[in-house]
């Protein structure tokens, strides 16, 4: 029997160690039995604003059997969660990943998910339930189209200070948040890194390490003028004799001008193209320029480092809690893990495998929709259109006014409801 190369054996053992060390804390593809793992909250049921979830692949997909959960009612609150074995990311990388598709061409609503800690009554999970991490896209109007990354530290929710744009089309996208033991993070969309940095700089979790010295003052001899007047520059001879305005040589006395009645005619004046305003010497670089003065940075006496700044010690639930004006957001392939490579692989095996087919299905659905809209549009002859225009000419302004008033009222109502919901988040 041939002996195996010791180096080959070492490589196999190393690969096995890597595989074993990678841990999947929670993974949900919403296959059979998903309802036993997820608890629908009773939040907002009493005031009849709780939305229903639908188990579906959506109106277009790359695989009709690959289903997720989708919001199904407009102007509703949604809350659902699943429990997993309590997990701490101390000394580990934390990976939080999921996919979401906004089939409704979302104009105001969330597409984010949450990780929660400690014990939570899942039947009461809602907007007021404390969470550890909130991550994912949020869209509202033209101003809000970003990826939320909110971390809870010492009972306070802290928003990321960097703007991370989210996807706004009607296709599936994968959102990934990676948090490492060195307090660095990455945000990926569709397996492409969109933002990376440090918890210290990109969130206000702790006071700043360094601050400007409040007792420092700019030295009296500090010259911060970058340019100065040229001391060798002199005013040209006769410069002050150039008038600001001159008579218009093209002007002519009107034919009906009467000197006796109107007085002596004088040509109007026009701006003098040779006049350059008050003379000032030209500017030159200041040889004594020291730059803009800045107070020196000193250690912040308020800063106290926390080596476990990145740690969430009792993660136990994953959930969706959001408000939607228009329903149709579909969540799928939820993952909590300590292995970024596994997360990338899962994204490619799900979203990556089906994205082209999904795009083709979407394009076909759009084509059919446009054809149906074209069929529904009334076809009228030119004569009929002219007759109708004559009949309705007198009513156009009234109808237009009523239509505008109705539209204005609807928009005002929608804006008020949207603002109220966002205030609640």
From Swiss-Prot:
Tell me which Pfam families the record gives.
Calreticulin
Phosphoserine is found on: 381, 397
Q: What positions does the entry give for an alpha-D-glucoside binding?
A: 112, 114, 131, 138, 321
Q: What organism does this protein naturally occur in?
A: Arabidopsis thaliana (Mouse-ear cress)
Query: What are the record's GO terms for cellular component?
Result: endoplasmic reticulum; endoplasmic reticulum lumen; mitochondrion; nucleus; plant-type vacuole; plasmodesma; secretory vesicle
Give GO BP annotations, semicolon-separated.
protein folding; response to endoplasmic reticulum stress
Record flagged with keyword Transcription: no
| Protein's name according to its UniProt entry | Calreticulin-1
Principal subcellular localization: endoplasmic reticulum
Ranges for the region named Disordered are 213-281, 348-425
GO MF terms listed in the record are:
calcium ion binding; carbohydrate binding; unfolded protein binding
Q: Where is this region: 4 X approximate repeats?
A: 194-259
Keyword line: Calcium, Chaperone, Disulfide bond, Endoplasmic reticulum, Glycoprotein, Lectin, Metal-binding, Phosphoprotein, Repeat, Signal, Zinc
Could you tell me which cysteines form disulfide bridges? Answer: 108-140
Q: What is the purpose of this protein?
A: Molecular calcium-binding chaperone promoting folding, oligomeric assembly and quality control in the ER via the calreticulin/calnexin cycle. This lectin may interact transiently with almost all of the monoglucosylated glycoproteins that are synthesized in the ER.
Q: What residue spans carry the Acidic residues bias annotation? A: 379-398
- The short sequence motif called Prevents secretion from ER sits at 422-425
Residues with glycosylation annotation: 59, 154, 399
Give the subcellular location: Endoplasmic reticulum lumen
Chain positions of sequence repeats = 194-205, 213-224, 230-241, 248-259, 263-273, 277-287, 291-301
Induction summary: Induced by cadmium.
Which InterPro entries does the UniProt entry name for this protein?
Calret/calnex, Calret/calnex_CS, Calreticulin, Calreticulin/calnexin_P_dom_sf, ConA-like_dom_sf
